[in-house]
Regions:
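Terminal and linker regions of secretory-pathway proteins
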Residues: 1-330
Length: 330
């Protein structure tokens, strides 16, 4: 939580342009080729977004974020009524495994009183859906990809697993045992592996700032130079760009990928949202859960386990068998 969909989603992943030096270049894989896309910097305090009351930034949580996001969409549709009634899909990645289901749930509930959201589906990429399952999948992922030793894998799954470490860390009660285990894991995985794509050169990563939120131990004393991210930061801090975007900085000196003023209730990580996904399916909302298979932060193995269990509990059947998926010749 606390990182920008403008900086990451729009400029590093699926937006219409990417920064290249002093200019923008077209992204041939832009989602804008298929739909009108809004990239929302949320909650207030992220990126260019701000609150008139700085006290807002203290203790922001999932519930507040869902309500604020829904109010934003309500007011956006009021301002641009030509978009009312159009099919609406909401998408996100990582901690948006909380943001998106919770927002969709609020929209479904609101529609019972006043149907203004034509919500058709949601898409969740490598999402945090259930804290222990998702976070503890990291150990097996590291081990299976040769990033940690057998001995480290054993202590990372028995002495102190990742969900326990994160709980202690954000709860301000980090035990010496978990500190030792994470030091060992960090030493072996190193800061030269992009945790969001373990096969990439770290310089090509676009999302390492987020990993400092979901991998808190690794933020101490480390600053990895990430090329795409750095170009985005430089571009969005240009005065002429800010003027063109009608954006201004309030309460911060510069635009950053992840907020330095927001104090999010990070233990909201422990709130499961997989059941919310199930309720959305029951209400007729289409749900896509997809995973990049080289992401070690929220590995596909955890997501697959959660989705399979949900499908079993709901009595859902497989309609399309598992298959090789080609895009062009790849």
């Amino acid at each position: 939580p606390g990182c920008s969909s403008l900086g990451v989603g729009a400029f590093s992943e699926n937006g219409p342009f990417r920064p290249s030096g002093q200019v923008l270049v077209k992204n041939e894989y832009s989602w804008n080729k298929e739909a009108n896309v809004i990239y929302l910097e949320t909650p207030a305090g992220v990126g260019y977004s701000y609150s008139a009351d700085a006290a807002y930034y203290q203790g922001v949580d999932d519930k507040m974020t869902a309500m604020d996001n829904m109010v934003f969409l309500q007011r956006w549709l009021q301002k641009f009524p030509q978009y009312k009634g159009r099919d609406l899909y909401i998408a996100g990645e990582s901690y948006a495994g909380h943001y998106i289901p919770q927002l969709a749930e609020a929209m479904v509930e609101f529609n019972k009183k006043d149907r203004i959201f034509n919500l058709r589906g949601v898409a969740l990429g490598n999402p945090v859906l259930e804290f222990a399952t998702d976070f503890n999948a990291r150990a097996e992922y590291f081990w299976s990809h040769g990033l940690i030793s057998d001995a480290t894998y054993r202590v990372f799954t028995s002495a102190c697993n990742y969900s326990r470490y994160v709980t202690e860390y954000y709860g301000g009660s980090l035990s010496p045992l978990c500190a030792r285990v994470m030091n060992q894991v960090t030493r072996e995985t190193s800061r030269f592996v992009d945790k969001y794509d373990v096969t990439l050169d770290v310089c090509l990563s676009s999302v390492l700032s987020q990993s400092k939120i979901l991998s808190p131990h690794e933020q101490v004393g480390q600053r990895i130079d990430v090329c795409v991210e750095d170009e985005t930061v430089r571009y969005l801090n240009r005065r002429d760009v800010q003027a063109a975007l009608h954006a201004r900085l309030v309460g911060v000196d510069k635009w950053a990928v992840c907020s330095s003023v927001l104090e999010y209730e990070l233990l909201n990580l422990q709130i499961p949202t997989i059941s919310v996904v199930g309720s959305l399916v029951k209400s007729g909302i289409r749900v896509l859960v997809y995973s990049g298979d080289q992401d070690s932060v929220i590995p596909l193995t955890g997501s697959r386990t959660l989705v399979q269990n949900l499908a079993r509990d709901m009595g859902l059947k497989t309609t399309t068998p598992y298959r090789v998926w080609f895009e062009g010749q790849q």
